[in-house]
């Protein structure tokens, strides 16, 4: 298991080392369907994102709205992505993030591998420990203490990767504290030989260690620049301690999107998601005019952010994606 950062000095210097070698790779669309979206709504966003050149469509994996009534109700993330996989052709697909509390590791390995095959090898798995206790209570899902949730996450990652990497014709076994696998044929296999795994969050020790052991991408969602730098540094130290090359990890961030050609359009989009413009501006670099957003992204780029997830909360506003692609991404490409 990779160690935690050895000293404060190593943490503070690491973001500059990251920034020296990285630039934005791509922009991805990220939706929250539990707030109120049908499968058709999500498909429309995915198709628009694909047509506009975004590299990926990601969705949350939640069963309960954080605010509002969430009508018409939640949609299952992997059922949804299976459908979208058959109705798109190039855009990558994934979860940000699947909760390890929702599914047993064996069935999850099967579902992810199947959707990867259905998509022709375009799936990525974001996996986390789970945090939203109310949704577990609402849908009869056990919600163990935080330490146990992280233990289960680690075991799930070992089982998922173990099953996928077991050669065809051989079997996989695992004996852990929470899960046991006996004589599994470890089928089906994903289409991708090394299906990307994304781990994220702000945990100081176990999160960076798990990322260094299992992930090809580390994501920090909705945090200020200083917090992002600190967490990227922890992960970079863990990657180095694990003996991995520095460029084997992609560093990403997620932010709320609220862009407009002028202040009136920005205000209208903020109102559509029941947020105040100034509050959004203070918490996300993706809020403002295209020129403003390009400027605000600069420090995040310098801090080592390679990939940006646009949290699109109003899924009916496809013009929003068009504006960002045409006026922001164009300036950064």
Predicted regions located by residue number:
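Active-site-adjacent structural elements that line small-molecule/cofactor binding pockets in enzymes
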Residues: 2-3, 9-333
């Amino acid at each position: 298991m990779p160690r935690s950062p050895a000293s404060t000095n190593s943490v503070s210097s690491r973001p500059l080392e990251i920034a020296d070698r990285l630039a934005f790779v791509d922009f991805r669309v990220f939706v929250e369907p539990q707030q109120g979206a049908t499968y058709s709504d999500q498909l429309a966003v995915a198709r628009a994102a694909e047509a506009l050149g975004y590299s990926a469509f990601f969705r949350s994996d939640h069963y309960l709205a954080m605010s509002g009534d969430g009508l018409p109700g939640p949609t299952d993330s992997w059922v949804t992505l299976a459908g979208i996989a058959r109705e798109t052709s190039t855009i990558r697909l994934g979860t940000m993030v699947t909760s390890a509390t929702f599914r047993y590791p064996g069935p999850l390995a099967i579902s992810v591998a199947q959707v990867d095959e259905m998509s022709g090898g375009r799936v990525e798995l974001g996996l986390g420990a789970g945090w939203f206790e109310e949704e577990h209570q609402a849908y009869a899902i056990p919600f163990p203490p935080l330490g146990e949730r992280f233990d289960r996450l680690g075991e799930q990652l070992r089982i998922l990767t173990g099953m996928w990497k077991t050669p065809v014709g051989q079997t996989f076994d695992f004996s852990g504290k929470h899960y046991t696998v006996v004589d599994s044929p470890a089928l089906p296999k994903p289409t991708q030989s090394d299906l990307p795994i994304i781990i994220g969050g702000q945990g100081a020790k176990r999160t960076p260690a798990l990322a260094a052991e299992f992930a090809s991408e580390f994501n920090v969602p909705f945090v200020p620049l200083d917090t992002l730098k600190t967490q990227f540094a922890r992960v970079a130290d863990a990657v180095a301690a694990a003996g991995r090359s520095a460029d084997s990890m992609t560093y990403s961030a997620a932010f709320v999107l609220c862009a407009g050609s002028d202040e009136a359009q920005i205000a209208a989009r903020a109102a559509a998601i029941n947020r105040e413009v100034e509050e959004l501006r203070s918490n996300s670099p993706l809020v403002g005019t295209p020129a403003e957003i390009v400027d605000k992204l600069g420090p995040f780029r310098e801090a080592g952010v390679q990939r940006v997830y646009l949290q699109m909360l109003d899924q009916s506003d496809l013009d929003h994606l068009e504006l960002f692609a045409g006026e922001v991404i164009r300036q950064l490409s």
